[in-house]
From Swiss-Prot:
Pyridoxal 5'-phosphate binds at A84, R85, N191, S214, G215, H216. Its cofactor is pyridoxal 5'-phosphate. Gene3D superfamilies: Aspartate Aminotransferase, domain 1, Type I PLP-dependent aspartate aminotransferase-like (Major domain). PANTHER family: CYSTEINE DESULFURASE, O-PHOSPHO-L-SERYL-TRNA:CYS-TRNA SYNTHASE. Belongs to the SepCysS family. It is an enzyme of class 2 (transferase). This is O-phospho-L-seryl-tRNA:Cys-tRNA synthase. Converts O-phospho-L-seryl-tRNA(Cys) (Sep-tRNA(Cys)) to L-cysteinyl-tRNA(Cys) (Cys-tRNA(Cys)). The keyword Nucleotide-binding does not apply.
Amino acid sequence: MNLDRYRNIVRETERKYINVNPIQRGGVLTPEARKALLEFGDGYSVCDFCEGLLHEIEKPPIRQFHEDLAEFLGMDVVRITAGARYAKEAVMSALCEEGDVVVADSLAHYTTFVAAEKAGATVREVPNTGHPEYKVKVDEYARVIDEVEDERGDPPALALLTHVDSEYGNLADAEKFVKICRKKGVPALLNCAYTMGRMDLSNLSPKPDFMVGSGHKGMAACAPCGVLAMREEWEEEVLRGSSLRGDVSGREWPHKEVEMLGCTVMGAPIVTMMASFPHVVERVKRWKEEVRKTRWFVKEMERIEGVRQLGERPKRHDLVKFETPGFHEVAEDHPRRGYFLYEELKKRGVIGIQPGQTETIKASVYGLTDEQVEHVVRAFHEIAEEYGLEVS
């Protein structure tokens, strides 16, 4: 066993390169969060003065943060989880019984299916429009919910909509979704992994029953951390306390929330989320600027021969997927095959596209300066021209 490999683990990507990986752009730490990371990096560092519940700790101000975060989101109750997937899991575990059905969009993240499976439920999908836009047909939630009820005699246990999907970056109609669910009497969960911390969600009306988000994907926090927000009426059911009692010891923990396994995220992740929170509150006000940069990025990328943006047009979110047949043709004859594009970009100071992928690529310029976005575009243009692709 060679232990030396662990003695100097470093990561130079953010210092040396512009990172356009969509899952990382919203999780870049603020200077305040980096400082907090050093202060609270030791294990149970937030538990110096804990009276039994992590979300009630007042120093650091975790209890106050839960209240402020709920206000920021326009929801009633919040818990910090180890990621959006664990927030979904908590809701499904509380609401679903063996054999129940969860209705979800056909662009839902794989963790929606895994969480449902773990809860003993199955998933019925709502279709999308297919190539090239892949827009979720939100109106179809009503039909699918009715079909489930007709087949089973009971409505679905839960309906879930991915606010912005991780494949094409489409912004779905959350308010229409919630209205349909209200009318059908089905709890509505909005997966905001790519919108919470980027966009202002406080004005959604009507509110979903549940909203989940990602701290490390969208709130400038280190992993693993996420958010479960809910309307007050669900607090008792989803955040129920433990009811078991030890038959020998007689011990019981009625204040420990079952779906949270008593306590959730402690230490560096929650503290970095808190430290970045003032910045996040301000940056959601600049969302239109992020959309402007994204649309310019798309326009410049589509100057390259064959490049075509997939998903809804014009873009309303920073996550972009492109068809890149020209780069794919180059890759077929290149000694490095699909890795050539990643390597050519890295030589020009840009990383973040999936290594080996040239048929389609995903990227985000969220949080970059105009000059950095121009650098990214210039890198793609130079590579295209070097390999004989026309740039108009």
